[in-house]
Design a protein with these regions (language model features):
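C-terminal functional modules
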Residues: 294, 300-305, 312, 316-459
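Structured, solvent-exposed acidic/aromatic patches
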Residues: 1-5, 9-321, 325, 354-356, ...
Length: 459
C-alpha cells in the first residue's frame, strides 16, 4: 500500500516540477543522503511502472496483510488496491504517450489485459477520508493541515473578506453547454459572518436560485463569474436592491447588526462561489475514479491501442459515472436521470475527427478533475485540452498585483521550493542546468510535448 501511494505522491511532485529527488529521497533517517540527487522524469516514470507491476503481483496473492493502516475506502482489501494500482498504471501510461509512445502502449495494454482488473464503477473508486478539522489557510497561518478536505483548505478562502470565487474559465463552459453540473458545483452565498476555518451551512446562506432568477430577469444582466486573470472586485458587480433577493431582505430585517447588505457582501453574492458541499469534511478525497479510467480507455482506442469496446461507449459511460459520483459523494441537489440523459444526448463522438474526440474526452476529464486539481493540471498539459483563453487578451491589474513574470502564457511547471537552494544546493544547481540555468514556469517537463491550445490573440 505504501509503495503504491508513494508512486501516486511522487507522480504529483514530478508532474509539478519535472526532475526531482526520487531514488535517494526520504532515506536520510535510515542512513541515506540528506542531499538526494535529482532524477530524470523519464527514469522516475519507468520506476513507477516497475513498482506498480510488482505491487499488483503481491496484492493478487490475496494477502490482506500487505495492506496496513488503510485510510482509503478500500478498508484493507488487497484486490481493490490491485485494481487501483493497475488503474494508475493506465494513467501514467497515457501521460507519457506523446514522448514515449511504444512504452506507453505496452504498459497500457498490459494493464488492460491484467487479470486484476481496473476501477470500473464508482463503487470501486479510490478515495481517502478526511478528518473533521479546521482549515489552516487563513490570515496569519504558517502551516497547512493536509488531513482536512483539500479543496476546502485551498479554495474555501481565508475569511469572509477574502473568499474564493469561480472564474469564467470554468463557469462559462458549463453554462454554455447547459451542463447540469453547473449549479451543483457553483453556488451563490450571503456570508458576512462565515467561519474562516470551516465550510459551514450556518453562515453561508444559499441564495442561488434567487440570484439566478434575478440575473435572468429584466433587471439583471446575466451571470458574473470572475474575469480571467482578475480579482473578484475587478469589473465591479452592482448589488441588487434588497427586495430583489427575498432572503437578503428578510435577513437584513431580522439581523440588522450582521450587515448582510454592508461592506459589499450583497454584491459578492452575485459572484459564484465553489459550493461548500464540495468542501466539507465528510467529502472524500479523490485519487482515481471509474470516470477517469473510462476516459483513458476511450482515448486509448483513438490511438489504435488494443482495447475492446467503442470510444462512444466509454466516453458516455464516463460522463454518466462523473455525474452519478457527484450525487453519491456530495450533499447536492441530485442530478436527475433526465438531466443526465439530456446531456448525453447533446454530445457524441460518432462522425467526429480523432483530434476533436481527444478534445471532447479531455474537456470532460478537466471537469472531473476539479476534485483533483493536480491531476487536472497534469492532464491539461499532457492533452492540450481544453483550449484556454489567451491571457494576453486580458488586462494586467498592475495597480493591485505584482507580476513576477512578464510571460503571461500558461505555466507548464512550478518553480522548485526555495528551501532546495538552501539545503540541497549542489543538486539543485545541477537540476537548473538541465532547465537552461533558469528555474521558471515555462520549461516543459519531459512528457509535456503537446503545444498549448489557446484562443487567438485579439487583433
Amino acid at each position: 500500500m505504501l509503495r503504491i501511494h508513494r508512486v501516486y505522491l511522487m507522480a504529483v511532485l514530478t508532474d509539478t516540477y519535472g526532475d526531482v529527488p526520487y531514488f535517494e529521497a526520504g532515506k536520510a533517517l535510515y542512513g541515506g543522503s540528506a542531499t538526494p540527487a535529482y532524477d530524470s522524469q523519464e527514469d522516475i516514470y519507468n520506476d513507477f511502472f516497475k513498482e506498480l507491476g510488482e505491487c499488483i503481483g503481491i496484492l493478487m496473492k490475496g494477502n490482506n496483510d500487505a495492506v496496513t493502516g488503510d485510510v482509503t475506502a478500500y478498508g484493507g482489501d488487497a484486490k481493490a488496491w490491485a485494481k487501483y494500482a493497475n488503474s494508475l498504471r493506465m494513467r501514467y501510461a497515457m501521460r507519457i504517450s506523446d514522448v514515449a509512445p511504444e512504452k506507453a502502449k505496452a504498459e497500457f495494454e498490459k494493464a488492460v489485459a491484467d487479470t486484476c482488473g481496473y476501477i470500473s464503477s464508482n463503487a470501486e473508486n479510490a478515495t481517502i477520508t478526511y478528518i473533521d478539522g479546521p482549515f489552516t489557510l487563513y490570515d496569519g497561518a504558517r502551516d497547512l493541515d493536509f488531513r482536512v478536505n483539500a479543496l476546502g483548505e485551498m479554495l474555501y478562502g481565508q475569511d469572509s473578506d477574502s473568499p474564493t470565487f469561480v472564474s469564467a474559465t470554468l463557469f462559462n463552459r458549463l453554462n454554455d453547454r447547459k451542463d447540469p453540473r453547473l449549479y451543483r458545483i457553483c453556488r451563490h452565498y450571503l456570508n458576512p459572518k462565515r467561519s474562516a476555518v470551516k465550510a459551514d451551512d450556518a453562515w453561508n446562506v444559499d441564495v442561488t436560485e434567487e440570484v439566478v432568477a434575478y440575473q435572468n430577469s429584466d433587471k439583471g444582466d446575466g451571470p458574473h463569474p470572475c474575469d480571467i486573470g482578475a480579482a473578484w472586485w475587478h469589473n465591479w458587480v452592482n448589488a441588487p436592491a434588497n427586495e430583489d433577493i427575498p432572503t437578503l431582505a428578510r435577513l437584513v430585517n431580522m439581523y440588522p447588526e450582521v450587515g448582510f447588505d454592508q461592506s459589499n457582501y450583497n454584491a459578492r453574492m452575485m459572484r459564484p462561489f465553489l459550493s461548500i458541499q464540495l468542501e466539507k469534511a465528510e467529502c472524500p478525497g479523490i485519487l482515481m475514479t471509474s470516470t477517469e479510467v473510462k476516459f483513458l480507455l476511450a482515448e486509448a482506442i483513438t490511438k489504435g491501442w488494443n482495447v475492446d469496446g467503442s470510444i462512444e461507449f466509454y466516453y458516455k459511460a464516463g460522463i454518466r459515472d462523473a455525474m452519478e459520483m457527484l450525487n453519491q459523494y456530495y450533499k447536492i441537489k441530485a442530478i436527475t436521470e433526465e438531466e443526465i440523459q439530456d446531456y448525453l444526448n447533446s454530445t457524441t463522438t460518432e462522425g467526429v475527427s480523432p483530434e476533436s474526440i481527444k478534445e471532447m474526452i479531455n474537456y470532460e476529464a478537466w471537469i472531473l478533475h476539479l476534485m483533483n486539481p493536480a491531476e487536472g493540471w497534469a492532464n491539461l498539459r499532457r492533452s492540450g485540452y481544453p483550449t484556454l483563453e489567451n491571457r494576453y487578451n486580458y488586462p494586467r491589474w498592475t495597480s493591485d498585483f505584482t507580476y513576477d513574470d512578464d510571460d503571461l502564457t500558461t505555466p507548464v511547471r512550478l518553480k522548485y521550493p526555495n528551501l532546495e537552494a538552501k539545503y540541497n544546493k549542489a543538486n539543485y544547481e545541477k537540476a537548473l542546468q538541465k532547465l537552461g540555468g533558469t528555474d521558471d514556469w515555462h520549461h516543459r517537463v519531459w512528457w509535456d510535448t503537446e503545444p498549448d491550445h489557446v484562443t487567438p490573440l485579439n487583433p
